[in-house]
Amino acid sequence: DWACHANDAAASIHDVLEMSNAVQAAVDFYNAHPNETLILVTADHETGGMAIGYKTTNYDTFLTNLAHQKMSYAKFDSTYVQGYIANKTPFETAMQDVKNVFGLTLPTDPAAASAGKLLLTDYEVENLRKAYERTLQVGSSSQSKMSQQDYELYGTYIPFSMAVCHTINHKSGMDHTT
């Protein structure tokens, strides 16, 4: 639920796969005890509006890009971003972590030639830089301290993490309606 709210496609996909595993365990139990087992699976709502196909990939998908993402946005926030905020970490240092955790690679990185579809464009770098600078300004403040533009770009989430998730989603040919 929270992964979809935050437009974190990779974490959402992992959640669905884990749900599938849980349902399979219930089906296996049912097969062993069919007369005394009822399986009921429900959801309260869909969040995020995940869509496959994105304009900058000509609506092709590159879902293998998502395999480079090693943790959810929430774990990235707590493991890395909170430290960036506290220490005013330089953008280039943060981007090394983004490369290690999400696979997104700066054009100036020595490994840029082998980054493939995860090589960032100048436009993407600028969007990430703006989101990072905004993150250092507002930290993990409440929405009341963020501008309307911040809200439209990042929702109620930390700008840098959302920009990273949006970027890997788009490079993978995915988007969200929220």
Feature-to-residue mapping (PLM):
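A post-motif C-terminal structural segment
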Residues: 1-178
